[in-house]
Amino acid sequence: MSSVIQLRELQKSYFMAGQAIPVLKGINLDINRNEYVALMGPSGSGKSTLMNILGCLDSPTNGMYNLNGHDVSKMLDDDLAGIRNVEIGFVFQQFNLLPRLSAAENVALPLVYAGISKKDRIDRAMVALEKVGLADRSHHKSNELSGGQIQRVAIARALVNNPSILLADEPTGNLDSKTSVEVMELFGKIHSSGNTVILVTHEEDIARYAHRVVRLRDGNIETDTVNNNFSHF
């Protein structure tokens, strides 16, 4: 199975008062195409920093990051932004929808930056909304949608570019238990359709939906295990 992500001796330090503060201390990790992986770890483990690097929102201090055949380790910001828009679909805890836009217009936003025509943008947005069961809410704005529906719109937006990776950061953090289960079942269906899913969470109940769990502690990978008891949707 081919790797969509390869990390080799990945390090990240932040500098404060001229002193290097190591956050990631030599991460080695392979994630294969169509895997479903949960990244876990307590506060201060380096989990959020690793997510930012995987999402091309930050760059490592040292080491190698290969994303779907691209060495992104030393890319400049403009190049990183281009790779990010093509290769990665983001789902955030805070949804980040624009309230003045309809669901379809929010979903189509990544295609604006890709230079896609307006008609094609809306057509592709409707396909993505269909995947998450919200085609009949395409003209609704966020204040006309429930929390679960808003997160489904955010997931559709992440899928609209057909990215190599769906990267979800605490995607159920603002949802009640019932809606969280519905959203996680949707991620399971998305994974089953062929997408690579990386889920960042601190909740064991959410991580159990993944097929593999990588736990970080103090900037290192503590365990990397297959989850034989993952929840079926």
Regions flagged by a language model, labelled:
Residues 213-225:
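H-loop (His-switch) and adjacent beta-strand-loop-beta switch element
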Residues 3-216:
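ABC family nucleotide-binding domain
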Residues 1-13, 223-233:
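ABC-family P-loop ATPase nucleotide-binding domain
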